[in-house]
């Protein structure tokens, strides 16, 4: 029985794990070469046509096209390659849910840091920035990397915001405070979903400027405002809101700092107000799901935080006095659920 069981085992799953970077780098190279935007709205390309357009040899052009087709990013019709539906929807510049910014950030910022994951595990220190020179990942001296980061967050957040807005009813709470709201992606999408909603993005001054630009581009300046501030340094959060949103924020920080943020949320909310914590939630058994567990490792190379469980968030909220605690699950790239609490 033991021998037969051993023979049934296969290293193929390990091969898939070990070569996972092949998949990502194929996607990243195609994005770097702007392949999907080039193909959008066309009858497709041949290997020779792509080689000519990119001024490269036909051999690598054919190999890239074959790889992207195998991954479901392209479809081959006769000898011509066209975008698959998922590539056309999410990897073409200018599309509403363009995801390419996140791919670029992974390639330029996170891929090198993940190459030092073993070091991060041994030292319990981030590897995408130098903790001896910076107080956090947001203090980067390289404006280009910061721009890449925030564009990536906008890509990741836009579709996630729509999933959140469809999973949680905001129709009876017209005033939203988005704490650490980044480029205002959540606010833009939620205001599009809820015509009566108004929102305020509370962010660091340099990020608030990015948010203001995105809001103006979206034509929502009458419904979304930006307020510059620091949720650690400032003594209090702005008040007068029905709902406070913490979207992909708390996983950046250790427990004591998360509790400090939530304490300020409690103080800012009126009776009946809600706090919504949207994250890739690790399950209470701490066995997955994979996206949340791996995002937690990503927090190791990026931050002092980790991805927490619903039980942990509920405990912190309960300690502050929040009631009607519940977890709502949904499917999106940046979050798989939200923990909600109401101030009595």
Protein language model annotation of sequence segments:
Residues 2-5, 11-41, 52-174:
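Conserved Class I S-adenosyl-L-methionine-dependent methyltransferase catalytic core
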